[in-house]
Regions:
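Carbohydrate-active catalytic/glycan-binding domains of CAZyme proteins
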Residues: 18-380
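Bacterial Sec-dependent N-terminal signal peptides
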Residues: 1-21
Length: 380
């Protein structure tokens, strides 16, 4: 009896990390880190570097969605158990600094540059006290995955440059558009003007106290198989998505970019590639409230992009299970869809919806599951 008790104690000591409960992801539930604290990494993304996953996201306070801490980082070997690695990019107390404490810093994503050996972080930035008027990107770099990241700059995208997918005739037509003729929004004429480049032209140059360049709000990053990287963001007052190529060191734009679904009101882009085809899941623009997910595909990341039906299936699919897309994580030959259930009244209590992506009839499907384990899908 004593021997059996000793064996039982030994099993309890060595096997907890293999328990079914510990290896289960429960979408929408509290997800605790190694300290027993709900993971605070919202609107973020995950990379796999040398066999370790690193999750970066917005640190949310209890009462405000403004950035009071910065971008946090967690690490994991199995996608379930996460270790708090600290603040990868802290906000600063210097008055007037771009990332001053109290700014809006959202949707941080990190990619690794094989040539420079640096980790590059991009995020959506709004200056303190300016609401959502600035619509900037921010970029920072680090020599290690956990940071600290060094802030480089913020700004708007590709000032003075037309999209590469616009013909000369389309550019000439857009150049004739006058915002003064479209003061009333949401009319058929205004919508047509947006599609034709009304806001695109407006933001080509500095105006109304704003710097030149395209607006950049909800965003993600994508590194292609040829190691070229792209910045995908919601622009033109959240009415049109842009896909912009990054320089070889991933810290700036080359000037080459395209528009996706002009006037379609898409945000929260999450992109992945399977069997040579690019897929992008987005959401509509309904503030903090969830809506039906959208999906697009393309044979080239620079388009053209084709829209498909909502990929979500199951209870709550019509509102993306109460969440909003933030990232698609490649894991081996599969993919994990990541979304956030926002709680603006209690931001730090926002929840995560992670679900495996399946393919049916050639189309991605995100099916609701109360719980699932990465192992059952072959994720390692």
């Amino acid at each position: 009896m004593k021997r059996e008790f000793i064996v039982l104690l030994w099993l309890m000591a060595v096997l907890p990390c293999f328990s079914v409960g510990n290896m289960t992801i429960r979408p929408g539930q509290i997800w605790k880190d190694n300290r027993g604290i709900h993971i605070n990494a919202h609107g973020g993304g995950v990379i796999n570097h040398n066999g370790t996953y690193y999750w970066y996201g917005e640190h949310k306070a209890d009462t405000t969605s403004s950035a009071m801490v910065g971008v946090t980082c967690y690490s994991s070997k199995n996608l379930v158990d996460w270790v708090y690695e600290g603040v990868a990019l802290p906000v600063v107390d210097e008055e007037g600094h771009d990332i001053e404490r109290g700014c809006i810093l959202e949707r941080p994503k990190v990619i690794y540059n094989k040539v420079t050996g640096r980790f590059v972080m991009w995020f959506h930035l709004e200056l303190k006290g300016r609401g959502y008027a600035e619509a900037r990107y921010g970029v920072a770099v680090s020599d290690t995955p956990v940071g600290p990241f060094k802030f480089l700059r913020s700004g708007r995208v590709n000032p003075g440059l037309w999209p590469s997918d616009m013909s000369q005739a389309s550019r000439a037509a857009a150049d004739t558009l006058d915002a003064g003729n479209y003061k009333e929004w949401w009319t058929p004429a205004w919508r047509e003007a947006i599609v034709n480049g009304l806001f695109l032209k407006r933001d080509m140059h500095a105006h109304d106290g704003h710097p030149a360049g395209q607006m950049a709000r909800d965003m993600t990053l994508y590194v292609d198989s040829d190691d070229c990287a792209y910045h995908i963001y919601s622009s033109e007052d959240n009415l049109t998505l842009h896909v912009a190529e990054l320089t070889a060191d991933y810290t700036a734009h080359t000037g080459r970019y395209v528009r996706v679904a002009p006037g379609g009101m898409n945000e929260a882009p999450a992109i992945f590639r399977k069997d040579g085809k690019y897929w992008m899941i987005t959401s509509g623009c309904t503030g903090w409230e969830p809506n039906e997910a959208r999906m697009f595909s393309a044979d080239n990341i620079l388009g053209p992009w084709t829209q498909h039906p909502n990929p979500c299936v199951g209870p709550g699919a019509g509102k993306t299970f109460g969440g909003q897309s933030t990232y698609v994580l490649p894991v081996g030959d599969g993919f994990v869809f990541m979304a956030d259930i926002w709680r603006p009244g209690h931001p730090s209590d926002a929840r995560y919806v992670w679900l495996p992506i399946e393919f049916e009839h050639g189309l991605p499907v995100v099916r609701w599951r109360d719980e699932w384990t990465p192992v059952e899908y072959g994720f390692k």
